[in-house]
């Protein structure tokens, strides 16, 4: 009975399966399922080929660099920097990507390899910072670092036979002459490192004495040039005044550009009483004038036919006197020769005396003298060389 029921159930399942397949084929669902299954099988086969031929995630350049000693040292410094500041997330990426999960050196081994000595229990910062500091110190002052290493050995500095330090000593800030450095290296070997405290104390005094002597020589030469310039200018002024007494040449000289001091009392011509004659101590570097026409003292008297010629000469002399009076070429009793070299006029006011007036007076007295054609030429030259008398022959107040 059980066998018959099992056979009935099997027949029913077969009929149900056939009916289901026929229904799915008629609706197209079965064909679509078969196509999707075939596509999934092909995709699975393609993905399997890609996974097998896929290149591993390895950086060849980094791998070659880490195989060297310096490369592992750099990677260890970076890892120590991240560990010092507890950058755990960055370390989680750094180690897998560089394939350095194991094999990097610790802080103590790194400090020993780099020659960094740390006191126990004192950690100032990452080792990478100490490496950068040492590089900066070497760039700034290699000489000072070498001196510190020499002093750390505990050996006292040796001295040369002359007691002078070698070229490795600290340079002095006081300027020295070029020849001093050459004298300093005499009798020393190039490889010796010698210093001397006595030399460092004596060198500033020697350089100071040399600078003082140089400055004194410079000032002496400067004073000599000034004295020669002043003497040459005085000689040129005398020559120009003796050769060219007229006012046209005098006006071009900057010596007469100083303002003329106004006197309290002035004197002028008898024919032109309103015209003032200014005084100027411009002839202070010339000899004193004692007489206006001393050169005509013993000249022979003029003849009557030549009196007309003398009057013509008188007019010319008046014109010359007017030019001289307009320039104010007067002298006083006391002359200060130092005033010629001062830019500011510190000249004291002195009594004025017109040279042109004295020319007219002396000429009127000597009109009847002898032939003065040659004497009158000497007259213009004597005006700048001779000195006026202390007492004037004629004075007239100006209204």
Curated annotation (Swiss-Prot):
It comes from the Eukaryota. The keyword Cytoplasm applies. Residues 142-216, 236-311, 328-354 are annotated as: Disordered. The modification Phosphotyrosine is found at residue 337. InterPro entries: FOP_dimerisation-dom_N (IPR018993), LisH (IPR006594). Residues 163-172 have a biased composition (Polar residues). Residues 197-216, 290-302 have a biased composition (Low complexity). Residues 259-275 have a biased composition (Basic and acidic residues). Residues 175-186 have a biased composition (Basic residues). One of its GO terms (biological process) is positive regulation of cell growth. Residues 246-256 have a biased composition (Acidic residues). One of its GO terms (cellular component) is nucleus. Homodimer. Part of a ternary complex that contains CEP350, CEP43 and MAPRE1. Interacts directly with CEP350 and MAPRE1. Interacts with CEP19. Interacts (via N-terminus) with CEP350 (via C-terminus). Required for anchoring microtubules to the centrosomes. Required for ciliation. Belongs to the CEP43 family. This is Centrosomal protein 43. The gene is Cep43.
């Amino acid at each position: 009975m059980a066998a018959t029921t099992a056979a009935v159930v099997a027949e029913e399942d077969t009929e149900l399966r056939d009916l289901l397949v026929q229904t799915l084929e008629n609706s197209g669902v079965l064909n679509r399922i078969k196509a999707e299954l075939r596509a999934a099988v092909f995709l699975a086969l393609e993905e399997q080929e890609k996974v097998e031929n896929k290149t591993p995630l390895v950086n060849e350049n980094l791998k070659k660099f880490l195989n060297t000693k310096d490369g592992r040292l750099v990677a260890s410094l970076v890892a120590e920097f991240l560990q010092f500041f507890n950058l755990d997330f960055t370390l989680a990426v750094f180690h897998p990507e560089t394939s350095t999960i194991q094999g990097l050196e610790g802080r103590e081994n790194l400090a020993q390899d780099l020659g960094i000595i740390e006191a126990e229990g004192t950690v100032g910062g990452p080792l990478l910072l100490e490496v950068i500091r040492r590089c900066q110190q070497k760039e700034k002052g290699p000489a000072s670092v070498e001196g510190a290493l020499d002093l750390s050995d505990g050996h006292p500095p040796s001295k040369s036979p002359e007691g002078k330090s070698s070229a490795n000593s600290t340079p002095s800030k006081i300027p020295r002459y070029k020849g001093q450095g050459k004298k300093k290296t005499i009798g020393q070997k190039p490889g010796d490192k010698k210093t001397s405290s006595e030399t460092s104390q004596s060198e500033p005094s020697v350089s100071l004495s040399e600078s003082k002597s140089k400055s004194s020589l410079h000032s002496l030469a400067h004073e000599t040039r000034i004295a020669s310039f002043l003497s040459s200018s005085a000689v040129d002024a005398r020559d120009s005044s003796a050769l060219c007494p007229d006012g046209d040449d005098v006006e071009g000289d900057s010596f007469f550009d100083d303002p003329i001091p106004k006197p309290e009392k002035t004197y002028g011509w008898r024919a032109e009483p309103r015209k003032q004659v200014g005084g100027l101590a411009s002839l202070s570097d010339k000899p004193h004038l004692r007489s206006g026409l001393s050169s005509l003292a013993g000249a022979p008297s003029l003849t009557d036919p030549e009196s007309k010629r003398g009057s013509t000469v008188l007019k010319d002399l008046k014109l010359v006197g007017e030019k001289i009076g307009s320039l104010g070429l007067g002298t006083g009793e006391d002359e200060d020769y130092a005033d010629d070299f001062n830019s500011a006029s510190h000249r004291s006011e002195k009594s004025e005396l017109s040279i042109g007036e004295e020319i007219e007076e002396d000429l009127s007295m000597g009109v009847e003298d002898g032939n003065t054609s040659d004497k009158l030429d000497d007259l213009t030259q004597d005006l700048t060389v001779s000195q006026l008398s202390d007492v004037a022959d004629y004075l007239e107040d100006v209204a």
